[in-house]
Structure formats: structure tokens, C-alpha cells
Amino acid sequence: MATRRQPLIPGWLIPGLCAAALMITVSLAAFLALWLNAPSGAWSTIWRDSYLWHVVRFSFWQAFLSAVLSVVPAVFLARALYRRRFPGRLALLRLCAMTLILPVLVAVFGILSVYGRQGWLASLWQMLGLQWTFSPYGLQGILLAHVFFNLPMASRLLLQSLESIPGEQRQLAAQLGMRGWHFFRFVEWPWLRRQIPPVAALIFMLCFASFATVLSLGGGPQATTIELAIFQALSYDYDPARAAMLALIQMVCCLALVLLSQRLSKAIAPGMTLTQGWRDPDDRLHSRLTDALLIVLALLLLLPPLVAVVVDGVNRSLPEVLAQPILWQAVWTSLRIALAAGVLCVVLTMMLLWSSRELRQRQQLFAGQTLELSGMLILAMPGIVLATGFFLLLNNSVGLPESADGIVIFTNALMAIPYALKVLENPMRDITARYGMLCQSLGIEGWSRLKIVELRALKRPLAQALAFACVLSIGDFGVVALFGNDNFRTLPFYLYQQIGSYRSQDGAVTALILLLLCFTLFTLIEKLPGRHAKTD
């Protein structure tokens, strides 16, 4: 029998249960809204809907190609970045990390400025007397944008694997005279192949659920994904039943991909070494030339679109656009949504990790993993699917709200939780390993422990998680695409309206402001803990 001294639910378990229950309830509510709105007899017609199967096949095909084109070059780029030290290397690695949170529409705008029919390369070809035939629309444009986003991320993750190789192995290989193919096969490949499957699965999942990229560069019915078909069913055809059916298909596919990614991630093992930082630079001439070529090609992929956003944004329309009240209303809307979503995301993530940490400390590993998985399962319901469920749920009950602030904030916070989990889970475990027994012996627990230990020791990870969540929210377009209107517009939604109305110069200014806002917000939040903040 439970007593006051032994409550039925321990206090340390309540935060995680509340956060997990909230996310599971929201997901179930969205799922039920989709299920109840799906036509009862429609499932039998799916097999006869040729266009629907074309959309499903294209979604898988473009995601597969994007993963291959991102991971294969990343293997060689990661090796080049590991072996070479050059001025600006740290800046390049930071740029590789920033592409993951770069607003999609900003990158698309830069890609169009470089590779479009009137872009930089087209002008260069014309000066050389050649004809520029590449079109950034359709499958090739989608692949180009996906590689721009995911190749740097894959390179960073594979570089971490190369840095995990024990220095003793590299020294032994150098003593044995291993070079080239043999060194790659026997030393580097066993470590890379552990990381490649989960990285490829993650990129495949992100590209499969891509929305803004396909919406901007799809180019027509032949290049449409499931998420874009959901958006079209709601925004243009207003067919909630078809949108619900498509959203269920999308959710099932994403759930399978999430579980596959989690399964593959278990194969990664950390490296143990007593020789930290030792590396064989492999200074043969052809190795140096090959590495330099790979690094230059990576710079040519990443820098021109970003430079194009800055150059095109400084045009004659700049003073006129800056004087428009609509622009600053969109800036304010984006900022308040991003900050609110970021704070909510970090709070929910800490609630999950707090209870998960306590469960792991009590050797209840399965329960702790299950609690953490509840935060990752939100990836099975991409933003457009979650927003569709909310749309149908509200439309069939109390009606759509005049202001979509609450829905957008809540949805963006949920979508950022997996990223915040990845940032905070290892620091939380380190804090437990260092101070867990001390806190237990001193009787420090609950709010007191949070204030005295976690909030002080986790200043930098908390700031980084908040920065990621805020910038991911400020650049989001998938959720706002459903609820945005003339009275509720964020900067990405305003940029999409400008691009759609062929106001390219105005759009260039907005893209520049959005880019500067993201980098400024990310930098300021990261510096909140101060230069001398400690994490131990």
C-alpha cells in the first residue's frame, strides 16, 4: 500500500511521464483525427490510384538518391578534412554544422541565384559563348538542394568516426607502411562502416519528409512527394479525406524509417585510445592534391549560394523593403514563435531526460530508453502531418483559430525535441556520473538539484539546444504553410509569397534578413552562458 513516505509515483518520474504523456496524447489525437477523416472505402482504391503510387515511388527514389549522393562523397571529404590542417578549417567545419539549421527557403533562393536560368553560372556560360542548359527545377534541383544540406552534415559525422580511431592503430599502420587503399580498407573502413548506415538512414528520412525544398523546386506533378501532395490536398483542393489518407501513409513510412534508424544507430561503438590526437598526414603529392580538390569542391558547393543571398539582398529595393511594416511584422512573428518554441522544447527535453536519467541510475535501462524514444518518435510524424491532424481536429470541433501562434509554437517545439535530445543526453549522463553519488549522499534532489547542479553545469549544452530549437523554428515553413495568411505570416511564409508573386528583388532582401536573423540569433543564444561558463 502506498504511503505518504512512499508515493505511488516517485517525484523524479513525474516530469518525464508528463512530457511523454503530452507528446503521445498529441500524436494520438492527430492520428485519430487523420484516421476518422480518412474515407472508409478509400483504402481499397489505393492500389488502383496510379498517381498516388507515382508520388510514393518518387518520394522513396529522391530520398534514396539524395542519401547516396550525400554519403558517398562525404566519406572522401571527411578523410580529407581529417588529414589536412589549413587556415579556415574550423570555420568550414562550423559552416558544415550550420547548414543543418539553415532556413530551407534561404538556401533555395541562393541555389536559384547561382544555378537558375538567369543565375551566376548562366551568365558565366553566356560570357564564354556557351548555353546553360541545367534547370534547378525537378528532380535534379531537389537533389542539388538535398546534397547542399546533407553532405556537410554527413561529413561532420563521418569525421567524428575517423577521429575516434585509436592512435595506436594509426601508428601501427604507419610502421607497417600501409598507405592508400590498404590503409583505408583495414584501418578506416571498419570505423566508417559503423557510422555510414545510421547516417544514410537519417539523411534518407530527412529527405523523404522534405517539404519546402520540393515545394520550391519540384517543378510539377512529376516531382511531387507525399508531403507536398498533402499540402495540395488541403490548400488547393480542400480534400481533407485525401489529405488524411496521404498523411497516414506518410506517418507509417516515417515510423518505419525512425525505427530502422534507431536500430542501425546501435551499431556505433566509441573508440578507446591512449594516444590522443596522433595522425598520419599522408603527405604524398597525389594525396595532397586529391584532398585539396575535394575541399575546394566542398567550398564551391557551400559558399556560392550563401554569398548569392548576401550579394542579391543588397540591391536597389533594400531601402523600400526595409520601410515596409509587413516585413517587420513578419520578423516579430518569427522571433516570438522561435523563442517560445525553443524554450518549450528545452523544458520538455529536460523533463524527459531528468526522469530517464533517474531510471538509468536505478538500472532500469529499458524504461529509460523507452522514455527517450517517446521524444524521438515525433520524427514519425513530420510537421506537415502533425499540422494536418491539428487542422482536421480543430476544423471538426471548435473551428480554426484566428491566430495560429499556439499551434505553430507547439508543433515547432515538438519537432525540435529530437535535436535537443541529441545535444543534451550525453551531458546529462556525464553530470550523473560525476555528481550523482554526491547529490544522493547530501540529500540534494528535485528543484534544489536542478538549480545547484544541472542549470550551472549544463549552461553551454542548454544554450546550444535552445539555439538549435529557435533557429529550426524560425526557419520552418511546413507548418506555417497550412496556417499562414495575410494576418499571420512569418519570414519564411513572407519570402514564399514574394517568390510566388515574382518579386525577386524584394525576396532577395527578405532572404538576406532571414539569413542574418538566424545566424545572429544562433550566435547570441550560444554566447548566453558567457565565455568562462563551465560544463563540469
Curated annotation (Swiss-Prot):
Protein name (database record): Thiamine transport system permease protein ThiP
Disrupted-gene phenotype: Insertions in thiBPQ cause a defect in the transport of both thiamine and TPP.
Lineage: Bacteria, Pseudomonadati, Pseudomonadota, Gammaproteobacteria, Enterobacterales
Subcellular location: Cell inner membrane
Membrane topology: Multi-pass membrane protein
Domain of life of the native organism: Bacteria
Species for this entry: Salmonella typhimurium (strain LT2 / SGSC1412 / ATCC 700720)
Protein family membership: Belongs to the binding-protein-dependent transport system permease family.
Induction: Expression is repressed by thiamine.
Function of the protein: Part of the ABC transporter complex ThiBPQ involved in thiamine import. Probably responsible for the translocation of the substrate across the membrane. Is also involved in thiamine pyrophosphate transport.
Subunit details: The complex is composed of two ATP-binding proteins (ThiQ), two transmembrane proteins (ThiP) and a solute-binding protein (ThiB).
GO CC, any one term: plasma membrane
InterPro entries from the UniProt entry: MetI-like, MetI-like_sf, ThiP_ABC_transpt
Major location (coarse): membrane
One MF term in the entry's GO annotations: transmembrane transporter activity
Residue ranges annotated for the ABC transmembrane type-1 domain, each copy included: 56-261, 331-525
GO BP, sorted A to Z: thiamine transport
